[in-house]
């Protein structure tokens, strides 16, 4: 006989921040009767999901990976942006074994050092200061051929903001006396994470064959031509930057290829195309035997050198639930599935004992403003079914809409996205009430609450540093002020009457009435 559970659900509304300014604030302007009612009826507060409170530099906007690691681990986890920045500052970066060995092997082979990554000051997937340090290191160790393959942002930065970065690196290579920007392509292609291999193949062929839609003599010219085609940074078509002889820089046997993204989810697919022997995402015309380095570990089964291996997080929420013989469900759409599983578990791929997972396919559309509801209805169908089954003690669910639609820059679509999520929350809360369950409703970071950049007038497609909501739909009580994401796991364990592991430095911020 199956024991009936009283589930505690954590609903993470991705990209759903709180902002006083209501101008182009999709969260404010959306018709959200369910959340309005819950805010009026239940304990609620605002908590921090950015900057020092999540292990990022002061003032740095939060992001989904960082948010879920902090939530799931119950502690402030110092992020790779901070960790690698510090290594550069104190000189440790220049001695990093994986980086140094790859450069030295390429030089010994009379080969080239290829550096690829998101060329952006956004700090979400990469930081251009890290890429600059890598270029400087390659030249300092004697590399005569240094090629930068620039993936352009426009999601975590304004849609047309790459010119300054490309111009800076042109100047940098002039100063260094060698090296150049060798190719330019939007992250839409190079950093897909939804198995749209036709996109990734364009970046792969650009780097390995020099195959491109466009050819230019310098990177800024390539960008200006893209803007003339009405392509924002994110969507810049494959552009080879040719040398004085009209040749493109192509990855060859014996070269080094160093991937400077530190965030895993959007780095995995293109990495697999370079390193997996049995890769079948698309037909590869060439497979250069290069020395590939991942800046961080993108997945446990990817066989490549790692410059900065993951720090081991023990006694995360998932592990604590396992040790207490509790059952748990992780559920989301494709776009945020890795966040409620891999990242929430502190970078561990394998499920814990008693942990089930449900993946709902995200819709196959070019950009999510075309379908702002995404797959939220189907996700909620499965979530309600899981709640009604009373199989699970804890359910972790992410609704991606606020973030994924917020990134498109479309205010009207972001409003629709928020409204779709509100409808779904109503169904979930009703289902929980029927089984005497409870839930916490929160967000990992902001996005949809600011859809216009007030300084430039451009669409605001990036995350924000705003506080995020926290609502407790359950017993009578109150929520303490000054909470942060790392307080959620200790709070959940306390609500369940479970012991909080000593490794969790967050605190329980919900006080139940006597």
Curated annotation (Swiss-Prot):
Pathway: Carbohydrate degradation; glycolysis; pyruvate from D-glyceraldehyde 3-phosphate: step 3/5
Presence of the UniProt keyword tRNA-binding in the record: no
Domain of life from the UniProt record: Bacteria
Keywords for this protein: Glycolysis, Isomerase, Manganese, Metal-binding
Active site: 64 (phosphoserine intermediate)
Recorded GO CC terms: cytosol
Cofactor: Mn(2+)
Residues where Mn(2+) 1 binds: 403, 407, 463
InterPro entries (UniProt xref): Alkaline_phosphatase_core_sf (IPR017850), BPG-indep_PGM_N (IPR011258), Metalloenzyme (IPR006124), PGAM_B_sf (IPR036646), Pgm_bpd_ind (IPR005995)
An annotated GO BP: glycolytic process
Single annotated GO MF: manganese ion binding
Residues reported in the UniProt entry to bind substrate: 125, 155-156, 187, 193, 263-266, 336
Catalytic activity of the protein: (2R)-2-phosphoglycerate = (2R)-3-phosphoglycerate
Family to which the UniProt record says this protein belongs: Belongs to the BPG-independent phosphoglycerate mutase family.
Quaternary data: Monomer.
Name of the protein: 2,3-bisphosphoglycerate-independent phosphoglycerate mutase
Organism: Shewanella sediminis (strain HAW-EB3)
Gene, per the UniProt record: gpmI
């Amino acid at each position: 006989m199956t024991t009936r559970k009283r589930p505690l659900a954590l609903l993470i509304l991705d990209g759903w921040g709180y902002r006083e300014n209501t101008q182009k604030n999709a969260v404010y302007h959306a018709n959200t009767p369910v959340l309005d009612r819950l805010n009026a009826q239940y304990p609620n507060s605002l908590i921090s999901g950015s900057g020092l409170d999540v292990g990022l530099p002061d003032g740095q906007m939060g992001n989904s990976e960082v948010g879920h690691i902090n939530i799931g681990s119950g502690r402030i986890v110092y992020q790779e942006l901070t960790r690698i920045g510090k290594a550069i500052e104190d000189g440790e970066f220049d001695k990093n074994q994986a980086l140094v060995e790859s450069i030295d092997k390429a030089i010994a082979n009379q080969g080239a050092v290829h550096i690829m990554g998101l060329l952006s000051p956004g700090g979400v997937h990469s930081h251009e200061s890290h890429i600059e340090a890598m270029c400087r290191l390659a030249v300092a160790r004697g590399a005569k051929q240094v090629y930068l393959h620039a993936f352009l942002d426009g999601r975590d930065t304004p849609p047309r903001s790459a010119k300054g970065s490309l111009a800076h690196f042109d100047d940098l290579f002039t100063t260094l006396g060698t090296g150049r920007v060798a190719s330019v392509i939007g992250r839409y292609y190079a950093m897909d994470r939804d198995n749209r291999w036709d996109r990734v193949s364009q970046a792969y062929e650009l780097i390995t064959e020099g195959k491109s839609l466009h050819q230019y003599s310098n990177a800024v010219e390539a960008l200006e031509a893209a803007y003339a085609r009405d392509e924002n940074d994110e969507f810049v078509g494959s552009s080879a930057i040719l040398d004085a002889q009209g040749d493109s820089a192509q990855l060859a046997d014996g070269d080094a290829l160093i991937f400077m993204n530190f965030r895993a989810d959007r780095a995995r697919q293109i990495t697999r195309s370079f390193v997996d022997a049995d890769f079948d995402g698309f037909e590869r015309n060439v497979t250069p035997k290069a020395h590939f380095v991942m800046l961080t570990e993108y997945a446990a089964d990817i066989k490549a050198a790692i410059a900065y291996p993951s720090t081991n997080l023990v006694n995360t929420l998932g592990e604590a639930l396992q040790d207490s013989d509790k059952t748990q469900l992780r559920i989301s759409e494709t776009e945020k599935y890795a966040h409620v599983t891999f990242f929430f578990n502190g970078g561990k791929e394998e499920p814990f004992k008693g942990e089930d997972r449900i993946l709902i396919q995200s819709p196959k559309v070019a950009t999510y403003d075309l379908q702002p509801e995404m797959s939220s209805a189907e996700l909620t169908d499965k979530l309600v079914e899981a709640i009604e089954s009373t199989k699970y003690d804890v359910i972790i669910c992410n609704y991606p809409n606020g973030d994924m639609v917020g990134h498109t820059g479309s205010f009207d679509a972001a409003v629709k996205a928020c409204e779709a999520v509100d409808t779904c929350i109503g169904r979930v809360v009703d289902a929980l009430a029927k089984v005497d369950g409870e839930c916490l409703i929160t967000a990992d970071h902001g996005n949809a609450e600011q859809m216009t950049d007030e300084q430039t007038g451009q669409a605001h497609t990036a995350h924000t540093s705003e506080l995020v909501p926290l609502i407790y739909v359950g017993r009578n009580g109150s929520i303490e002020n000054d909470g942060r994401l790392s307080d959620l796991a200790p709070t959940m364990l306390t609500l369940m009457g479970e012991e909080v592991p000593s490794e969790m430095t967050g605190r329980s911020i919900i006080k139940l009435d006597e």
